C-alpha cells in the first residue's frame, strides 16, 4: 500500500503488537479453543502485514490456506477432543517446560543479535536491483511461479509435507 509514512508506521506497530499478543495467547492460554482462535488472529495479522508490504497474492494465499483451511481444521480437531484430557494432571511447571523455555530464549537472543549485527543496507539494495530487473520481464503471478519452481522449490515442498503431516495428525486426533 502506498500510505504516508506515519500511517504506515502506525499500522506496522499495531499489527506487530497484535502478532505478539496473539502469539502469547497461543502459548499461554490453557483452553485449546482459545489458543486456536488466537492462532487464527496471528495468521490474519500476518496476512495484513503482507498487504501492507504490497504482497497481495501472498496475503490472499495466507488467508485462504492458513486461516481458511488449516486453522479451521485445528479448531475442529480441538473441538472433537475430550475436555477431561486438559482438566486433569495440570502441572504448572515441569523440567521439559524449563528446557524448552531455555532453548527458545537462547534462539530468541541469537536471532536478535544476528538481526542487530546484519548490514541491512546491502540486503535492501540487492533486493531493489533484483526487483528492477524482474519487473520488466513478466507479470507478478509468473514471477511467483518461476520462484516457486526454482529458488523456493525445496522450502515449498517441505511446507507441503509439514501441512500433510498436520492434516493427518488432526484427522487421527479427531477420530480418537
UniProtKB/Swiss-Prot annotation:
It is a multi-pass membrane protein. It is found in: Plastid, Chloroplast thylakoid membrane. One of its GO terms (molecular function) is quinone binding. NDH shuttles electrons from NAD(P)H:plastoquinone, via FMN and iron-sulfur (Fe-S) centers, to quinones in the photosynthetic chain and possibly in a chloroplast respiratory chain. The immediate electron acceptor for the enzyme in this species is believed to be plastoquinone. Couples the redox reaction to proton translocation, and thus conserves the redox energy in a proton gradient. The chain crosses the membrane at residues 10-30, 32-52, 61-81, 92-112, 152-172. Its main location: plastid. The gene is ndhG. Its EC number is 7.1.1.-. This is NAD(P)H-quinone oxidoreductase subunit 6, chloroplastic. Signal peptide: none annotated. GO terms for biological process: photosynthesis. NDH is composed of at least 16 different subunits, 5 of which are encoded in the nucleus. It comes from the Eukaryota. Gene3D superfamilies: NADH-ubiquinone/plastoquinone oxidoreductase chain 6, subunit NuoJ. The keyword Electron transport does not apply. Belongs to the complex I subunit 6 family. GO terms for cellular component: chloroplast thylakoid membrane. It is an enzyme of class 7 (translocase). The keyword Ligase does not apply. Keywords: Chloroplast, Membrane, NAD, NADP, Plastid, Plastoquinone, Quinone, Thylakoid, Translocase, Transmembrane, Transmembrane helix, Transport. It catalyses: a plastoquinone + NADH + (n+1) H(+)(in) = a plastoquinol + NAD(+) + n H(+)(out); a plastoquinone + NADPH + (n+1) H(+)(in) = a plastoquinol + NADP(+) + n H(+)(out).
